[in-house]
């Protein structure tokens, strides 16, 4: 089982972000009491699930957010101790934490996070150019990234991921590759490289809608993506999903669990869980979430995952990965033969350079991954036509 811990707090909201988060910092009233209430409810939620699920091994824990590194290391230590007590942390479990560079500028804090049990850091770098960091509303600068990485390596962190963004307003391929080179000089074990998505209602989207900034043209963004793949590969980082690259042995086990359909338990406001054929999402409202926990009903909005939804999800998530979709799984989930249903469609994708068919697996090429949403939507329409 995987466990995801959603930490809903941020010092401020970045200009591109539409995720659920709550302000936390010196200017926020009652910060300490809000964190204490959140911690108590989260541990209570763990207790409730332990009573329902019984003891089972946990292969991965991911502290996401929000900004988990805003909370003191004793929070992560307490959560991991409770997970191990109730469920059992498997030997060699991957324990990841998202962190902002400015949260890791004190060596003592870095030491404490690793001592608490964190063995993988996913750092929200986004850009190595201070001009773009300011445009994105990020609270750190390039110098903070360098210092944070220095502290992490000195403290013994041997599994470091850097999160980067491409397709930024005013960016071209040369600038993106320069950013990548700068980040790769830090020798990360993992890189996540995401194309910027303008979320409705965010400050960045409003600026774009008002004509105050422009995004790179589609063909320029395609070059950024494909040239980025080549540069990352030249530095020993293999692409294993649309936006994720790693050195051998450093694929994110947590994310691979999501993409391969593993059960996962999400804890905290706005966290989603999928367990034993059911799915639910906790309310994003912290007060309501705490009331749900106090009432002993953390999954009150659970719904069953139908066979069609299960099939769609396995197709969609598998085709995000470079390993692709195993055709035998289609038979298991639908009772039908994939190539009998979709063989001609597959051959068209292969001929267009968008996919490869290797024995019993269908996988998208880098060019196919660029248009994966359209490919998957087309496949879902075919399922409708078949009455599945």
Regions from the PLM with identified roles:
Residues 1-2, 21-52, 56-336, 386-388:
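C-terminal scaffold of the Radical SAM
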Residues 4-6:
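Short active-site neighborhood of thiol/selenol oxidoreductases, capturing the structured segment around
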Residues 8-21:
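Local cysteine-cluster metal-coordination motifs and their immediate loop/turn environment
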Residues 336-350:
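Short amphipathic alpha-helical interaction segments
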Residues 351-360:
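A short, conserved structural fragment
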Residues 361-365:
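Minor-groove-contacting beta-hairpin "wing" of winged helix-turn-helix DNA-binding domains
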Residues 369-388:
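Short, amphipathic alpha-helical interaction segments positioned at domain boundaries
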């Amino acid at each position: 089982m995987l466990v995801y811990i959603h930490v809903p707090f941020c010092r401020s909201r970045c200009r591109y972000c539409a995720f659920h988060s709550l302000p936390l910092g010196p200017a926020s009233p009652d910060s300490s009491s809000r964190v204490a209430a959140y911690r108590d409810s989260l541990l209570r939620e763990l207790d409730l699930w332990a009573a329902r699920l019984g003891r089972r091994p946990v292969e991965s824990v991911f502290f996401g957010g929000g900004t988990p590194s805003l909370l003191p290391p004793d929070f992560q230590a307490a959560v991991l101790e409770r997970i191990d007590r109730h469920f059992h942390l498997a030997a060699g479990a991957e324990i990841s934490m998202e962190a902002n560079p400015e949260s890791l500028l004190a060596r003592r804090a870095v030491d404490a996070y690793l001592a608490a049990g964190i063995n993988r850091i996913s750092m929200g770098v986004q850009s190595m150019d201070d001009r773009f960091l300011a445009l994105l509303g990020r609270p750190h600068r390039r110098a903070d990234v360098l210092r944070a990485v220095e502290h992490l390596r000195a403290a013994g962190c041997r599994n470091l991921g850097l999160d980067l963004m491409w397709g930024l307003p005013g960016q071209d391929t040369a600038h993106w590759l320069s950013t990548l080179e700068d980040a790769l000089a830090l020798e990360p074990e993992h890189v996540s490289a995401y194309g910027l998505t303008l979320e409705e209602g965010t400050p960045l989207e409003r600026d774009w809608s008002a004509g105050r900034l422009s995004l790179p043209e589609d063909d320029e963004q395609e070059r950024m993506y494909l040239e980025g793949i080549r540069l990352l590969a030249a530095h020993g980082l293999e692409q294993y999903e649309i936006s994720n690259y790693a050195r051998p042995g450093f694929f994110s086990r947590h994310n691979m669990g999501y993409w391969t359909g593993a059960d996962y338990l999400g804890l905290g406001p706005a966290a989603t869980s999928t367990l034993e054929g059911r799915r639910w999402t906790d309310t994003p409202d912290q007060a309501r979430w705490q009331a749900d926990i106090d009432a002993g009903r953390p999954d009150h909005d659970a719904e069953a995952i139908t066979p069609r939804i299960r099939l769609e999800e396995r197709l969609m998530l598998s085709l995000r990965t470079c390993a692709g979709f195993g055709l035998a799984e289609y038979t298991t989930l639908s009772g039908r033969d994939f190539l009998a249903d979709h063989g001609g469609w597959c051959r068209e994708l292969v001929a267009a350079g968008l996919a490869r068919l290797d024995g019993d697996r269908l996988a998208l090429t880098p060019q196919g991954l660029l248009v994966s949403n359209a490919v998957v939507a087309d496949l879902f329409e075919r399922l409708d036509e078949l009455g599945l």
